[in-house]
Design a protein with these regions (language model features):
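Terminal amphipathic alpha-helical/low-complexity segments used for targeting or macromolecular assembly
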Residues: 1-56, 112
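Short secondary-structure boundary/capping segments
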Residues: 2, 49, 128, 134-135, ...
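Gly/Ser/Thr-rich helix-start
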Residues: 8, 101, 146, 164-166
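Residues at alpha-helix boundaries and short interhelical turns
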Residues: 35-36, 67, 87, 172
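Short conserved AdoMet
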Residues: 54, 98, 173
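Flexible, glycine/small-residue-enriched loop-and-beta-strand segment within the central core
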Residues: 63-73, 78-155
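C-terminal/domain-terminus segments
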Residues: 149-177
Length: 177
């Protein structure tokens, strides 16, 4: 279930959302405490974190997922050190991708206008700042180099190379460098 996928404002501190995130954060810590010499245990934990995961997927670690369950990873994909995924809504990653160290995928957004960033009343009667989220999609056979940040609403087409240090603010057509 993609609770935050409609682009509408939501309260990230709703009790049920916090419960999911705390569970995922605990699993992140568990995964990160294991060494690469414990592949079976790491595999079990990462499968608990992710919504879907294909075959032959490897996360070097450490990893940080926000929800985890909103992320789907295809087959034969490698993630180097320090992969961060703020998956407040859907993140899909295709087959045969490589991610360099320190890659961040972010789906949440806060309003751009100052008046819209003020605290609003949540369903539980507590005033909080709201946010919204836009999905991120990475196609097949992509290479996302070191220190790349992919921002909300971006689609990276099949066969792309995103150069080291890039901040991806807009969608990228297939087979682009």
């Amino acid at each position: 279930m993609l609770e935050n996928n409609n682009g509408e404002m939501f309260c990230p501190n709703d009790e049920w959302r916090v419960k999911i995130k705390r569970r995922t954060h605990m699993l992140n810590q568990k995964y990160n405490s294991l060494t690469e010499y414990q592949p079976e245990a790491r595999g079990e934990i990462i499968r608990e974190i992710l919504g879907e995961m294909g075959e032959n997927v490897y996360f070097q670690g450490p990893v940080t997922f926000h929800y985890g369950k909103h992320t789907k990873v295809g087959n034969n994909t490698f993630f180097n050190f320090n992969f961060t995924c703020q998956d407040d809504t859907e993140v899909t990653i295709g087959d045969n991708c490589d991610f360099g160290p320190n890659v961040t995928i972010a789906t949440p957004l806060h309003p751009m206008l100052a008046d819209e960033r003020k605290e609003l009343m949540c369903p539980d009667g507590v005033a909080r700042r709201l946010c919204y989220a836009k999905p991120v999609h990475v196609g097949n056979r992509c290479w996302i180099c070191a220190n790349v940040t992919i921002l909300p609403g971006v689609t990276i087409g099949d066969g792309c190379v995103i150069g080291a240090g890039s901040v991806v603010t807009r969608s990228i057509p297939a087979n682009s460098f």
